[in-house]
Amino acid sequence: MLSDARHTIGTSVLAAADGADILVTGVNTEDYALAVSQARGTPIVLGHLTPWLLTDEFPQPLTPQVVPADQSAEQYNLGTHQVAEDVYWQGKRDDINEFRGSLGLPPAPSAALTWTVELGLPTLQAFSEEVVPRPHDWGPRNVMTGFWRLQSEVRRRVGEAEIPEWLAGWLAIGPPPVFLGFGSMPVLDPPKLLDLIVRAAERTGLRLLVGAGWSDLSGLTGELPDTVRLIGAIDHDWLFPRCRAVVHHGGAGTTAAGLTAGLPTWIYTVFSDQPFWGDRVARLGAGGYSNFLEFDLDHLTGVLGQLVGEDVRRRAAAIGERLRAEDGVSAAVRLIGEIAGRH
């Protein structure tokens, strides 16, 4: 089934590239997009929402972020990048090279993540140097643009721009709430989770706004006190400046939105690159992170107490001010246009 999915990805990339002046690809499709670029002679730009490229400055984002005591940081960091890419390439190599063969191309010597560096292809790093300082061992073709924030028109198209009247009213009648969002992390027991959040609101005296994400929390709103509310998909760029702090799953986009709004942040991680972003938040002094397995009433109330402290609030606000001065989308558009214009 996985092989069928990869075949579908290749077919979709091939179709999407028809008539394109330039290809812009994320990490999940870049092996296929690189093959199409080479077969058709179309220029290509890579776009990374998380820092996947090899460096000795931090671990590969999908691996543990704590350096073992018996290794140097440089040794461990490089090793995690190399092992992660080896595992990735072993799993995808046959499918990628089969796709390349269908386009009349020779097999790839390695995953695109490494090969594109050797080829000198440009990569747009869609995050800020304020959050991820530029690694010393990245070449000049790796351009850190700043975070890519969705424009309001795009928000409207995906149904996130509509602001419910009840929400605007609820925000107006009390102090800013703390936002708790679960994003793509499904909640296994919604009633139990909501009961925990209600008790946390009672214990801390804070107002809590719960973003359901992919979880089905419908039908539970009738049981809520005035201090707790539920919402579905919404524009974080609108909402977060009206909040006091954020607690979430640690996706790259939600992390960027919270930090850009200048909010103290706590990340409950489950998998993927979430611990990486949690570690970034902790290093900034803008909050912290822990495994979602630690999520219980005592832990959450302790986290909420930390996030409303004056020191973390001040540090997060300063970071947000610097991030709001950046325009990652405009920087990326300008660079893509320059590259397309050279071909």
Where do the language-model regions lie?
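Nucleotide-activated sugar donor-binding and catalytic core shared by glycosyltransferases
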Residues: N77-L78, Q82-Q90, D94-F99, L103-P107, ...
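Nucleotide-sugar-dependent glycosyltransferase catalytic domains
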Residues: M1-P177, S184-L206, L220-G222
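C-terminal substrate/ligand-recognition segments
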Residues: L180-V210, S215, G232, H236, ...
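Residues in the short beta-alpha loop(s) of Rossmann-like NAD(P)-binding domains
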Residues: T50, W214, F271
